[in-house]
Design a protein with these regions (language model features):
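Active-site beta->alpha loop and helix N-cap motifs at the rims of alpha/beta catalytic domains
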Residues: 3-19, 23-27, 31-95
Length: 95
């Protein structure tokens, strides 16, 4: 498994599962979104995101903006990006 060129990211928001999979060397990072966070019980997006970042400070974490218009998405993305050195911001694309 060490010669796999694909990086495996877990697409989850449950803190218990993030803690579990963060210990797995095969998992290279995490990605989540506002919908998954809400289902996991998040009430405050920033506070919940910071909990995720505290669990896995050394792996990439992709967080998604939840605004609907360009200016708000850009503003949110810039703010979210300051939450940690390992943060990657996702911008949803729709037709």
């Amino acid at each position: 498994m060490n010669n796999i060129k694909t990086k495996i990211f877990c697409d989850i928001a449950e803190l218990k599962l993030i803690k579990k999979f963060n210990k797995k060397s095969i998992v290279k990072g995490f990605t989540t979104n506002p919908t998954l966070m809400k289902k996991a019980g998040a009430k405050d997006y920033k506070a919940y995101s910071k909990k995720i970042l505290k669990i896995c400070p050394d792996k990439p974490v992709s967080l998604e903006v939840f605004a609907d218009d360009y200016n708000s998405m850009r503003s949110q993305a810039l703010k979210i990006n300051t939450w940690g050195k390992n943060v990657y911001v996702k911008i949803p694309v729709t037709n």
